[in-house]
């Protein structure tokens, strides 16, 4: 038997009485009163195949079939007596007339089903080709494919050109560490894998392409976490002559189409909420706030200043902050031990302590309540909009520590207390980022986005004298507390780009050596241009309701940037290294 008439998940009541030919894997086999039932699975779903004892040859063969065998089945579609409302094909079954075993299978080291979620991730990644057979993961990749196609079709309709940019590029100091590729032809020299197509897409604007996009593979050698991978995919977009407002409106329209095509959601707002970077940090302690719930940070400096609690006073005297979050109605649900665990959590973000108070009908209760007389207690209650039964949590430190620790605590409590409506998709634009940040350890400024972001022209006069106050013409798209992507207007004038390089610590010679091709391009009539890059893996993760980026990538790396399936990275032969003019110097492990 060759060929296939239908995919398994698409065998419906409309085919009753017809002969079909199906292919797939055995999800399970059951023997019941002489009848053999086989659940046959392909990527569209499962259909029940019935083998009757009167078909003796097929019945004998079916007795030898085990889970994950690959079958070719021919049979007639009939209505099921005992319907299964939990299956799309639950109203029908296929009475087998012929079965051919295309391939047998050993017992799999991991289950092919939801129960695989209880198996260690390392084992699932080692046998990723089996893990990917799971219907839940296959559904995620169907969603990913639909997302990519929707984006590609939308941008094509908007007259964007899809252009591929080089994978072997020049190493430039613009962000994380590069992955390097040695050149055999040019011994001792290296290519870098692109962290993004940033420079090439800007050069395409110089070339007059006007509107460009690419679903691009990118590589960053950085410390990993649940929502990061060393190789990832981004939707890369660049436009010339387009107003920032128009670009943002276009992205809003595109995301609306993605939500409708993938999840059937038609409630995505035509315009997304906007918030400045300063407001996001002030209210949520994060530049990518999850706005699906409250627990906002409250500045209580005016309410606690002078009360006599030395920790608060010392922070304020050293230009620090005292902020609180009001956990409404939870005072009785948090023991001292519970709060100690929260304190351990905030310590990871640099907080030296987590002060707390419980609000009662009589006033304030807790280890620092003695510092707040009736007047100060009332001021604090009013500042935090507190009522009896509320739990107040405080951090006093420098602004970055207050934001990081309370911002993270806010999200932790939001999840643990069930405050987040998981059915919501809250899109948000965060704007007016600072152009640069000063790192005290290095004693230098770093670009918050990248060195090619245009400073706000209103602030250009501050670039040399007060760079920390310069705003960038930059915008991040945030969804449910994740940064979906970042964009900006680009620098397109050589003198501004050179000033930016100088601010970031480049000498004139270093700037020309690293980016001379870009600086020269700016002298040949470069148009104003802007763009954005959206993380496709992260977008799919959110749409699929997943919490791990690895679930959205077919063959992902582990947290240590290794592939358990292929054992990459791995040593190579000395002859290969010699051909590449490379000698390794591995330090002995102590």
Curated annotation (Swiss-Prot):
Q: Which positions does UniProt annotate for L-aspartate binding?
A: 174, 220, 449, 490
- Identify the coding gene: aspS
This protein's UniProt keywords: Aminoacyl-tRNA synthetase, ATP-binding, Cytoplasm, Ligase, Nucleotide-binding, Protein biosynthesis
Q: One MF term from GO for this chain?
A: transferase activity
At the top of the EC hierarchy, this enzyme's class is ligase
Say where the protein is mainly found. cytoplasm
Q: Which reaction does it catalyse?
A: tRNA(Asp) + L-aspartate + ATP = L-aspartyl-tRNA(Asp) + AMP + diphosphate
Q: Which InterPro entries match?
A: Aa-tRNA-synt_II (IPR004364), aa-tRNA-synth_II (IPR006195), aa-tRNA-synth_II/BPL/LPL (IPR045864), Asp-tRNA-ligase_1 (IPR004524), Asp-tRNA-ligase_1_N (IPR047089), Asp/Asn-tRNA-synth_IIb (IPR002312), AspRS_core (IPR047090), GAD-like_sf (IPR004115)
SUPFAM superfamilies linked to this entry? Class II aaRS and biotin synthetases, GAD domain-like, Nucleic acid-binding proteins
Q: What job does the chain carry out?
A: Catalyzes the attachment of L-aspartate to tRNA(Asp) in a two-step reaction: L-aspartate is first activated by ATP to form Asp-AMP and then transferred to the acceptor end of tRNA(Asp).
Q: Which residues bind ATP?
A: 220-222, 229, 483, 535-538
Q: Which organism is it from?
A: Exiguobacterium sp. (strain ATCC BAA-1283 / AT1b)
Annotated family: Belongs to the class-II aminoacyl-tRNA synthetase family. Type 1 subfamily.
- PROSITE patterns of this UniProt entry? AA_TRNA_LIGASE_II
Its recorded name reads Aspartate--tRNA ligase
Region (Aspartate) residue ranges read: 198-201
Q: Subcellular localization, per the record?
A: Cytoplasm
Gene Ontology CC entries for this record: cytoplasm
- Annotated GO biological process: aspartyl-tRNA aminoacylation
Q: What is its EC number?
A: 6.1.1.12
